[in-house]
Amino acid sequence: MDSQAQQLATRLTTAFNGGGAASSRPWLWRPLLQLLAQGRPVTVEQIAQATDRTPDQVREALAANPDTEYDERGRITGSGLTQNPTPHHFEVDGQQLYTWCALDTLIFPAILGRPAHVTSPCHATGTPVRLTVEPDQVTSVEPATAVVSIVTPDAPASIRTAFCNQVHFFATPDAGKGWLEEHPVATVLPVADAYQLGRPLTEALLTGDTPPGCC
């Protein structure tokens, strides 16, 4: 990954560290995603058992992320990976799930250790963007010209509002031009480059460390 992309990954991780994201609780992230991927709401007790933590420790960690989704019984239904419909369809092991943003679809297969089939509309035209993402690579992109929009928020209280809701697929770079005019500090990357961007970010979130090259 080139130095510009590395700097972008570092800025993203720094923002997530300040926004109550998974990097502040790396012990929680993978087990929670694995439980959510089963397609059923997740209880605090299930997470406590999976992480060898107490229920109170789990509740405290979940409370650090105000974007966590719950059902009417207080069970977790979403945290990046979600059981609630979004534009980003994410199928793993035959289970239809969703993600909060386009970049999530590229990084979660590595976390889950499972391939995923992704379908998401171009944010400008509605043209379906379809991907197959393995834990270690993207194996197909249709259309091949698809790009991902990326923003770098400044340690927001809500990662979902400031980051996820701005990270879309576009069928072509040209399709993203109008959106970029409205978001001049954002950028768009080819899917393969966005995947590479996500790799050090994923590692940082799993370990709680910032990527190499951070000051």
Swiss-Prot record:
GO aspect biological process, one term: response to mercury ion
Catalytic reactions of this protein: an alkylmercury + H(+) = an alkane + Hg(2+)
Highest taxon, organism lineage: Bacteria
An example Gene Ontology molecular-function term: alkylmercury lyase activity
EC nos: 4.99.1.2
Record keywords: Lyase, Mercuric resistance, Mercury
Entry protein name: Alkylmercury lyase
Organism: Streptomyces lividans
Organism lineage string: Bacteria, Bacillati, Actinomycetota, Actinomycetes, Kitasatosporales
